[in-house]
Amino acid sequence: MSTLRLLISDSYDPWFNLAVEECIFRQMPATQRVLFLWRNADTVVIGRAQNPWKECNTRRMEEDNVRLARRSSGGGAVFHDLGNTCFTFMAGKPEYDKTISTSIVLNALNALGVSAEASGRNDLVVKTAEGDRKVSGSAYRETKDRGFHHGTLLLNSDLSRLANYLNPDKKKLAAKGITSVRSRVTNLTELLPGITHEQVCEAITEAFFAHYGERVEAEIISPDKTPDLPNFAETFARQSSWEWNFGQAPAFSHLLDERFTWGGVELHFDVEKGHITRAQVFTDSLNPAPLEALAGRLQGCLYRADMLQQECEALLVDFPEQEKELRELSAWIAGAVR
């Protein structure tokens, strides 16, 4: 019986694919070596410990129907579209070794005619006339008895969209001598015009088989039926939930301020696990009562635009004469936290 397992997803849903990954990882035998190949439609994928409001332009994502997905590994935020091929290698310990999976991907690229090399801990780069350019980024997860290495390969991703949805740390970029996110990366189509997702998957699969000296039939994961994986429904529900994707953000504070015709408003929020734990309101409005009431109502509220709007509009019952001000305030707060 083969020690290998190969799974290929036909779904473009990031929550579905990450749930498949999680289920396989949890239930795989320690002696198995797994390769999972997949890709996502328009999505920003953030690391397990990241704050989406800090890392992403969540308002723009909502306007453009770009999903947010939190993965279970660490690392930074990345934009996925169908021009990305995603791979996940899994193995039990002590055999799990990310240098093996990295070499498999490098061998696959080499077979396609691309000479790439590992750079730092997470990246694969190619040499271009403009210097080294990243074509792959990775992240890792380990438990007591197993580990996985997952990453992306840029085939023909729309790189102009990266800046639309990601807010890179400018200090970090400056420290590395990088002027923009776009200048760091390149698509494999620049080196191999016409390269397809299917060709890349085939090359990685063949390199995987060659490394282990075994072959196995691929299991196709269809989006049209629930995968036969233990606890998939529960895992998918968690992976697609607001509580996981947004609510798992580390504690943070948010200061909002705006001047309206009727006065200036400053809101201070402390947020933990996606809930407002403290709300303070400062204003020079001649009628501060509704704003003071709002501060009380927002304590414990989900840090979500629709919930904040709901709390603002609930004040119309007690302060009907301030309807204009409260509706302006509601629209502003909702826009500011999207």
UniProtKB/Swiss-Prot annotation:
Subunit structure: Monomer.
Domain of life according to the entry: Bacteria
Subcellular location: Cytoplasm
Binding site residues for (R)-lipoate: K134
Family annotation (CDD domains): BPL_LplA_LipB (cd16435)
GO biological process, one term: protein modification process
Keywords for the protein's UniProt record, in alphabetical order: ATP-binding, Cytoplasm, Ligase, Nucleotide-binding
Note from the entry: In the transfer reaction, the free carboxyl group of lipoic acid is attached via an amide linkage to the epsilon-amino group of a specific lysine residue of lipoyl domains of lipoate-dependent enzymes.
Function: Catalyzes both the ATP-dependent activation of exogenously supplied lipoate to lipoyl-AMP and the transfer of the activated lipoyl onto the lipoyl domains of lipoate-dependent enzymes.
Organism in which the protein naturally occurs: Escherichia coli O1:K1 / APEC
Enzyme Commission identifier(s): 6.3.1.20
Catalytic activity: L-lysyl-[lipoyl-carrier protein] + (R)-lipoate + ATP = N(6)-[(R)-lipoyl]-L-lysyl-[lipoyl-carrier protein] + AMP + diphosphate + H(+)
SUPFAM superfamilies membership: Class II aaRS and biotin synthetases, SufE/NifU
Residues reported in the UniProt entry to bind ATP: R71, G76, A77, V78, F79, K134
Stated name of the protein: Lipoate-protein ligase A
NCBIfam families reported for this sequence: lipoyltrans (TIGR00545)
Keyword Ligase: yes
